[in-house]
Amino acid sequence: MASLIYRQLLANSYAVDLSDEIQSVGSEKNQRVTVNPGPFAQTVYAPVNWGPGEVNDSTVVQPVLDGPYQPASFDLPVGNWMLLAPTGPGVVVEGTDNSGRWLSVILIEPGVTSETRTYTMFGSSKQVLVSNASDTKWKFVEMMKTAIDGDYAEWGTLLSDTKLYGMMKYGKRLFIYEGETPNATTKRYIVTNYASVEVRPYSDFYIISRSQESACTEYINNGLPPIQNTRNVVPVAIVSRSIKPREVQANEDIVVSKTSLWKEMQYNRDIIIRFKFDNSIIKSGGLGYKWAEISFKAANYQYNYMRDGEDVTAHTTCSVNGVNDFSFNGGSLPTDFAISRYEVIKENSYVYVDYWDDSQAFRNMVYVRSLAANLNDVMCSGGHYSFALPAGQWPVMKGGAVTLHTAGVTLSTQFTDYVSLNSLRFRFRLAAEEPSFTITRTRVSKLYGIPAANPNGGREYYEVAGRFSLISLVPSNDDYQTPIMNSVTVRQYLERHLNELREEFNNLSQEIAVSQLIDLAMLPLDMFSMFSGIESTVNAAKSMATNVMRKFKSSKLASSVSMLRDSLSDGASSIARSTSIRSIGSTASAWANISERTQDAVNEVATISSQVSQISGKLRLKEITTQTEGMNFDDVSGAVLKAKIDRSIQVDQNALPDVITEASEKFIRNRAYRVIDGDEAFEAGTDGRFFAYKVETLEEMPFNIEKFADLVTNSPVISAIIDFKTLKNLNDNYGITREQAFNLLRSNPKVLRGFIDQNNPIIKNRIEQLIMQCRL
């Protein structure tokens, strides 16, 4: 029947990568390399071990000390130690919360007997009795008062031979050091007004993070590092620590010059380049032990990434140049493993990555100067590829690595289906790295570079980060685009052609005779007979069929059937039948497209009509996998398609793939399907209508949705070419026998042709309605 064309396409369509649609990018240069193992063949070549050489250490060393800073009053950051380094006796530091704590730390030199000294603390002169019995260590004394007009009292001391003192705000407390070096420890005071604590040092000081408290304690007890005690270290003002760094815009557009019509714009951009290699592996004919070619192909990749908060859509095309041709011949017998040619990229090769994104920089990239780029290096390593031999152990090509180094950037153009993209071509030179690549169970070993068998090594893509800058001559009016951006590509021309073809196709529906449609629907239309009416089809039959199958592979029908085949057997065995209507959603999805299961929350509130609509939407797939003798909607669709192709003057072999794909998805949107159980028929349409009736009397009966779900799971599904409404109308006006009713229910094409030959208006009108639904 005519639906054979769809089944044939489903059975023979194959996946085609984007790279098949891209012609050769740049020039190609091949270099033949002959490997002569010589006397070292059995010892895996000469005993030479190549390594990567010096490897740089990228460890980041973070400084501990921040300073020194000059004395100045400031708000000590919470969670940071202030390490004071006074040079002589006197007041070292003051700190207060202006409500319950006034702390002043004084320093007393060694060997001081008890005496009274005058100190200026918080702006007032105070006489303090001091002493230091130690002859070697300096003494820090904490003088504290708890009221603004109170008297100072000694709260703690620190004997130090390093002459260093520490203070920190943290956890609503004030921390200091007490005791005697080298065993000084921290002490804390509760501060009432923690947020307003202000510290004023009277000596040079350093800032140390609390996370480095152990280092601070080490300095207090044992002194600063020698580098801090040289005359080359000069204290700076504390305000320098508060200078806010100016945020430089990494991605910016700068007007270099401007006239009335044109302006020069400098575009600076950070970019992330993602690319991947593609390959072609061709097996020779024969017994299955020979491979003809393993080669690199250009590969497209589209992705998104964030740049300064902007979502950027980028497109790359990766190609190689200067490949090296290798070969392997395991013997002259038909069962000896051999590869006629396999490509390898190494030191004498180049990798080209064409990059484009949707930013302003690429909008008018026609006249460009001062183009520069700086990219990181990236290491590419090959993966495993097993040569599946009919018998014996499989050889495996594995390993290989190269590093890509930036070698320059030029302008280029990428061609896609819809538009030509002015882009940047980044050129990379290669350096061979470890490991080498080998072919196991052969003498091919210790070769350097990446072979084309599996150049991505299982990765989705390689990534390079970098930056480019260019100056572009663009129109002064930002809304205007240079002419090259409006150029018509092959795909754009085809789109305009398809629009004209759709209009012509839809007008041809009225010219199709119903009798001719039935005749065509009953024919087993294959690929050649379906397209035989197109000029030059005979001469280009192979390429035309390939293009049709390639396009049809991406259709909704092909992808749905593909998933159905994988899930049908597992899903049918896991059907959970329930007395509740809610179970129907899972019952239907057991054999339908599993990825589109209705959520439980939706099923709880769904009506019978909506559930029937969901089920009937999948019945086309069920019918395709279980062919019946009756005529189905795809037979009608295929027949209409054939009739319109024969009459059309717009269709050609370039437009045909799009026509076939669109017809499979859009022809006859309103379909009804039925299942028969004895004398009972159940019918459901994609519009949510459902009927249950007796075949002999055509009397309606209650629609048992649970039984319907069981039947569509286990029984053949039939296209309701003559739906229940038409059938009942036919019986009421003309009367039909039980046998005629069964034949019409089963969509018997001979019976349908008989009614049409009798010029039955009801049947004829129904078929004409189906023809009118075959629109693009």
Swiss-Prot record:
Could you tell me the Gene Ontology terms of the biological process aspect for this record? permeabilization of host organelle membrane involved in viral entry into host cell; virion attachment to host cell
Q: Where is motif KID motif found?
A: 644-646
**Coordinates of motif DGE motif in the sequence?**
308-310
Q: Which residues form a coiled coil?
A: 491-518
Q: Where is this region: Spike foot?
A: 510-776
Region described as Hydrophobic: spans on this chain:
389-409
Q: Which InterPro entries match?
A: ConA-like_dom_sf, Rota_A_VP4, Rota_VP4_MID, Rota_VP4_MID_sf, VP4_concanavalin-like, VP4_helical
The positions annotated as site (Probable cleavage) read: 246-247
Q: Record's Pfam families?
A: Rota_VP4_MID (PF17477), VP4_haemagglut (PF00426), VP4_helical (PF17478)
Taken from the UniProt entry, a GO cellular component term is: host cytoskeleton
| Membership in a protein family | Belongs to the rotavirus VP4 family.
Record's miscellaneous remark: This strain probably does not use sialic acid to attach to the host cell. In group A rotaviruses, VP4 defines the P serotype.
Name used for this protein in its record:
Outer capsid protein VP4
Lineage from the top down? Viruses, Riboviria, Orthornavirae, Duplornaviricota, Resentoviricetes
